[in-house]
Each structure stands twice: as C-alpha cells, then as structure tokens.
Regions:
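Bacterial N-terminal signal peptides that target proteins for export
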Residues: 1-9
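Active-site neighborhoods of enzymes that stabilize oxyanions during catalysis
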Residues: 269-384
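A long, amphipathic alpha-helix that forms part
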Residues: 166-180, 190, 197-238, 385
Length: 408
C-alpha cells in the first residue's frame, strides 16, 4: 500500500514536538488536552450562513479552512480516516454498509451493534486514542465511530455507547466532567460527536431552515463547551471537523438501477449517492456487461478499475462493481423509491465536488491566529492531532500541509 513518506513527515512533526517541549522538566509534559469535535454533515460553506457565532469566533481567533473527504464521502469511513490518517481502502471501513469474505454471513451496518463493536472490522487502522493509550496517555471518547470496539485490543480510558437521544448539552456535560479530573488523571485526547446537522440535511436539504436550526443548536453546545473550559480553568486545543458535506437531491434526478440491470443478475448493497453491487454467482459477466458501460449521469467500474484519484478498490471489502452518479443524482429502484422518496440531501458523491467539502477549524494555544488553511485531503488532519497530543505517528496516508499551515 502506498503511503506518504513517513520519515519526512515524522521528522517534521518530531521537530514540532521538540520545540513545544523545550526547557520542560523531565517527566512533565505541559501539553493541554486536545478535543476533537465532529459536526456530521457540516458543509464547509455552512460557516458563511451567519448562524454559528461561536464557531465564527473560534475561526477568527484560530485556523479554519475546508477539507476534502475521502471516498466514499460517508460517515463511518471518514470518521475513521480522521483519527487514523488512512484512506478507507487502507483502514478497512470502506462504507457504512459492507461485507468481508473473512467474516462470512455478516453485513456491517450502522444499525448492526454486534458488527460495530467487533474489532475485526476496525483492526486494519490504528486510531489516535489507541496510540495514546499505548503511550500511557488517557483518552475519553464520546460517540466516535470505532470507539465502542477494542481496536487492536485497546479501549479508550473512558467512552460512551452511542445514544442518538442524548442531548448536545448532555454530551458537552460529559466531556467537561471528564476534564474535571486532577491534571495527572485528565484525558490528553477527547472526542465529541454531533449528528443533528447531518440528519436535518438528509431530511430537508442543505439550504433548509431546519439545517440552520441544527447548526445554531450545535453551535450553542460548542459555545457551552468553550465557556465550561474557561470556568474550570482548562486550556485546550479544540479541533472541529466534519466528515463530509451535503448535496441537494431531487425526484427529477434519479437513475433507475432496475431499468439497467435485471434483478436476477445480482443485488446492490449500497444505493443512493453511489452504488455497490454484487453479481450473482455465475452471472458476473452479464452483470458487468449491463453496468460497466456508458450511462447518462453515471459512471461504473470494476473494483480493479476505479480511478486512482479515489484511492479506492484494493481492499477485500470493496464490492465487485462500483457506480458513481453525477453529484445530486441518486441511484434507486422502484422498491427503494416506495420505501424512501428522493428528497432533501445526500452525501457519498464524488469527494472532489464542492458540495462534499467539509469543515476544518482549529482553536487554542497551538494554532495560528486568523489563519485560513488551504484545501487539503482529510487524511492530513491526523498528523495535526498527533502533533497536538504528542504521540508518534502510526502508519498513515497523511501529509504535512495542514499541520504546517495551521499550527504555530
């Protein structure tokens, strides 16, 4: 697997670590805690809507820019990329829904609690909390994908089982309570997750009143976190990211899969903003003939022929055939349309589409003030986190551009 040359990246980050530790007594590391916050579905340009004053202040007083999600621009693959620095094709969470020939009879899905907590799905990557725990640093995770499994045999010091009903205020309260521990027992790395913006974007579309309301609600929760830190005298580096953006979809922009390939030739696993397709045994050639050809508003490939720009197709969990529509077009069947009409918004589209760009924001003593960072791939967030936390890099696909632009 190709990787960014680790020697060069490690040297850059190590020099930063040394600079931050100069004249520090042995055995004492003054680094403040790092808090990683995900606002699921926060499109990069949402910051311009004028409904997030807390985030706007953090952006003015810190570093902010846009990041490009990894393919597919879905929730679980990109959340794991953010904390491992690996492309989905390398860390193994290649979709929200996937199969693995080494785990027969099981389909990984967000709703499959047994699969979500099974380390075998996650062990191809090393999230930063595992690296930190192995280095003797405490971590505390609130709802980050992967944190409910003992990845590579390691769990965070503290973590919570995902509960969508838990209010943003309660989530912030839990993070603040973790930080009330004595300095020697305080977590070095914490993560926090909010999904309301993504939910509203799916149901109502990215420019809807409901999205603005969800943005305001989430922004208020982050404001409470910042004030709570100040009240407790806790200085922290805060990194706010999103996993992907959101694009408008419409019933006028639908590609009917059942009009392209007969049902007996195979079955889709994922449909919508992209398609993963499994031909029926013995019908592979017919399925490929139907799908892997020219289509209006859609491109299809065998997994071995997916364009290199997507860094996707080598992992055993990638489906045999992948189809990607133009951004804003949805792949569906008559049956799926009866269950879920096409409306609102979606993601999973080409990560190079502007609508898929996600937020990056860094605030705290380690960040340059008033800096706009260049558009980078989201694998570059991981080296920033490693530098902040003070841990060695695990194997990753990230580069130094974001760290160089954002950090002092």
């Amino acid at each position: 697997m190709l990787r960014f040359p680790r020697a060069a990246l490690a040297a850059l980050l190590f020099l930063g670590v040394l600079a931050g530790c100069a004249s520090v007594p042995a055995g004492h590391d003054p680094r403040p805690p790092t808090i990683l916050i995900s606002i699921d579905g926060f499109r990069a340009d949402y910051l311009e809507l004028g409904v997030t004053p807390e985030l706007a202040r953090l952006a003015r007083e810190g570093a902010q820019g846009a990041i490009r999600p990894s393919f597919p621009s879905k929730t679980f693959p990109n959340h794991y990329t953010l904390v491992t620095g690996l492309r989905p094709d390398h860390h193994g969470i290649v979709d929200n829904n996937m199969r693995d020939p080494q785990i027969p009879g099981v389909t990984f899905a967000l709703s499959n609690r047994q699969a979500v907590t099974d380390r075998r799905w996650w062990d191809d990557g090393e999230p930063i909390w595992v690296t930190a725990e192995r280095a003797g640093l405490r971590t505390a995770i609130m709802f980050w994908p992967g944190s409910e499994a003992p990845v590579r045999g390691v769990r965070p010091s503290a973590w919570r089982t995902y509960d969508a009903a838990l209010s943003p205020e309660a989530r912030v309260g839990q993070v603040l309570s973790w930080l009330e521990a004595p300095r020697s027992a305080r977590p070095r790395f914490l993560a926090l997750y909010f999904e309301a913006v993504d939910t509203a974007g799916h149901h109502y579309g990215p420019r809807s009143r409901e999205v603005k309301e969800a943005l305001a609600q989430t922004d208020a929760a982050i404001g409470r976190l910042v004030r709570g830190l100040a009240e407790r005298g806790v200085e922290a580096n805060i990194v706010v990211v999103s996993d992907h953006g959101m694009a408008e979809i419409s019933p006028e922009r639908v590609i009917r899969l059942d009009e392209i390939v007969p049902a007996e030739l195979g079955a889709p696993l994922t449909m919508g903003a992209f398609l993963t397709y499994y031909p029926a045994p013995g019908r592979e050639a017919e399925a490929e003939a139907a799908l892997v050809r020219s289509h209006p508003h859609m491109s299809c490939w065998r997994k071995s022929q997916i364009p290199a720009a997507y860094h996707y197709g080598s992992h055993r969990r990638v489906a045999p055939i992948l189809c990607l529509p133009e951004t804003g077009w949805e792949i569906a069947t008559a049956e799926s349309l009866r269950k879920r009409p096409i409306k609102g918004g979606d993601h999973g589209f080409d990560p190079y589409a502007p609508e898929m760009q996600a937020l990056f924001l860094g605030y705290g003593p380690a960040f340059r003030r008033g800096t706009v960072t260049p558009l980078t791939d989201n694998v570059d967030v991981y080296p920033v986190l490693a530098r902040l936390v003070g841990v060695a890099l695990a194997e990753n696909d990230g580069g130094p551009a974001l760290a160089a632009a954002a950090l002092r």
